[in-house]
Amino acid sequence: MNLTVKSFGIITFIAIVSKLLGFGRDTLIAAFFGTSATSDAYFIASIIPTILFASVGMTITTGLVPIYANIKTKSNKEASQIIRVLGTLFFIMSILVTIIFYIYTPFVTRIMAPGFQQEQLELTNSLTRIMLPSFCFYVLSAVMTSILEYERNFVPPALVTIPQNLFIIIAIVFLSQTYGIYAIAITTLIGAFFQVIIQYPSIKKYNIIKFDLHFKKNRKVIKDTLFLLAPMIIASVAFQFNAVIDRMVASQLPSGSVSALNYASKLMYLPLSIILLPLITVLYPSVVDAAVEKGNSLCKMLFKGINMLTFISIPLLIVMFVESRELVDFAYRRGVFDETASNMTTNAFFFYSLGMLFLALKEWLNRFFVAIKETRITMYTSIISIILNIILSITLSSFLDVGGIALATSIALFTQTFVLLFFLPKKLVIEKKIFLAFCLNHIKLFLTFLSTLVLTKALSILYQHQYVIVQLLLTTFFTLLLFIGFSYLYKVTELREATNRFYNFK
């Protein structure tokens, strides 16, 4: 357990550094380009590589782990050889996919941004084609990440986004005046290449990064792997398609809506990426091991993960709800990012925040279903989610503008999470005692959330400060103080366990 806590601490620290750089990158983009037609073109152009990586790259990162773990129980050498073959296959496929999207870029961008004028579409096409080859490097990086994380070597995968963010920051400051938005696109591609370079020294000892074309010899494993990954890819594409739908609808709204939606989603993802996803990352290899061993610890780990994610999310959500405008102003309010841009972004950010916990829980539940090789469930629930999101985005944006689009996403995430929970008893034997304890603890967590939210909101009205940073610090301090106090009052299990771990760790 101490090793898990230590790993979580290390990758959380790296994630903070990475996200601060990423946030600095986004802040500079906002300051230099604002919510303009140029920034809209860049954000639409980045969707295709992002969707390809998030749907295929993240699927590889998650899906290869149980395959590698199963084979490794029999032979380390065979496990490495299989990963070499699969890695080669994925890389070849990524090149083919890149070529196809390169050819059909104008068609795809016109679908994603139907409200763009011709000049804006041409800029979007150029930026997209520059960034598309990054997908090939992302696939190689994903193969490396899956093995390193299973081997509990979390540091190199956590470091991969740092050089990319640094390159983009340098490009914005020193090159954007000369090359404009193209400087960001080019450095995005360079940064993707460095994701492979950073992980290579650590992955070299596992002997998996070599071209191995023995596809026929490993036909059965390849077939089983593709059958496992295919539903995951469909599920990931469906989830990423939500972002496309959001931006398609936003492109029909007033100019700058796409950028406001992008800035808001990145602000919402900040605590998710820094705290919640690292926790899922360090726990996932243990979930896979428990699934391979087929013991009774899998059920306990599942509910424990849900409890921990909910517990950690509560103070984050309260600060986001109470100080949504202040967070947006602190993050972006400079340069050409004016009052109008701030209003639009705040509107979207508040409603995106409603879905943060459900996004984290969805990721955790999806990992569980991957570990037990029931990936079709993740596919079905993702399809339900995207259909709901399309209907709600179109409907709610008529009333709430970009806020309606964000609210639609949050409602879709909420629905998907509870459908995944519905399938749990069908795939896992759940002890009645464990389930009752889980339900009781969540009642306590809900009471803690409600009590802390009401008092924090009341206090924030009383101590309004002219400096945004002071206001945010005060709200965060009172939120944490009240959260710990109510957790103690309601006897929340996670507070007691966190206290015990702290003293044991010391």
Task: Describe every region a protein language model picked out.
Residues 1-4, 200-239, 300, 426-443:
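Interhelical loop/hinge segments that connect adjacent transmembrane helices in multipass membrane
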Residues 98-118, 318-338, 458:
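Short membrane-interface helical motifs at transmembrane helix boundaries
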Residues 7-27, 191, 195, 199-203, ...:
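Transmembrane helical elements of multi-pass membrane transporters/channels
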Residues 58-73, 276-295, 366:
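Helix-loop junctions and terminal segments of transmembrane helices
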Residues 457-506:
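Membrane-proximal transmembrane or re-entrant/amphipathic helices at the cytosolic face
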Residues 116-144, 337-365, 451:
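Alpha-helical transmembrane segments of multi-pass membrane proteins
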Residues 155, 163-197, 376, 384-422, ...:
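Membrane-interface helix-loop junctions in multi-pass transport and translocation proteins
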Residues 137-159, 354-384, 395, 399:
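Membrane-interface junctions at transmembrane-helix termini in multi-pass inner-membrane proteins
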